[in-house]
Amino acid sequence: MLAPKKQKFRKAHKGRVASKAKAGTMLAFGSFGLKSIDGWRVTARQIEAGRKAATRCMKRQGRLWIRIFPDVPVSKKPAEVRMGKGKGSPEFFAVRVSPGKIMFEIEGVEENIALRALELASAKLPVRTRIVRRYE
């Protein structure tokens, strides 16, 4: 699973998702991509589930790029613990995905396979997405 090797700080603020993505809105590597419509927090597990679904559909052909990286530590308190007594310990990593951000890109497979792979990947993600082509 994706996680940063080093961190400057152990815990992060909850934060908010930015209004619209400023960078990473155009296809850079592949011919087909998965673009977010909503802004939401995507966890490392969800990214990995999407990657597995897409590569399984592509039958290990072509190439898949993941354009997002989970770098925000999300903390959580244990179940049935009273309020207060500090912030919980870091539980998992997530990335804040803004609307318009390209999340996955595919190259080197037929169009119908690429579209199916991106559909399967989008089903694993908590954001609404749309599939974009290079020349659209």
From Swiss-Prot:
The lineage of its organism: Bacteria, Pseudomonadati, Pseudomonadota, Alphaproteobacteria, Rickettsiales. It comes from the Bacteria. This is Large ribosomal subunit protein uL16. Binds 23S rRNA and is also seen to make contacts with the A and possibly P site tRNAs. GO terms for molecular function: rRNA binding; structural constituent of ribosome; tRNA binding. Belongs to the universal ribosomal protein uL16 family. PROSITE patterns: RIBOSOMAL_L16_1, RIBOSOMAL_L16_2. Part of the 50S ribosomal subunit. PANTHER family: 50S/60S RIBOSOMAL PROTEIN L16, LARGE RIBOSOMAL SUBUNIT PROTEIN UL16M. It comes from Rickettsia akari (strain Hartford). InterPro entries: Ribosomal_uL16, Ribosomal_uL16_bact-type, Ribosomal_uL16_CS, Ribosomal_uL16_dom, Ribosomal_uL16_sf. GO terms for biological process: translation. Keywords: Ribonucleoprotein, Ribosomal protein, RNA-binding, rRNA-binding, tRNA-binding. One of its GO terms (cellular component) is cytosolic large ribosomal subunit.
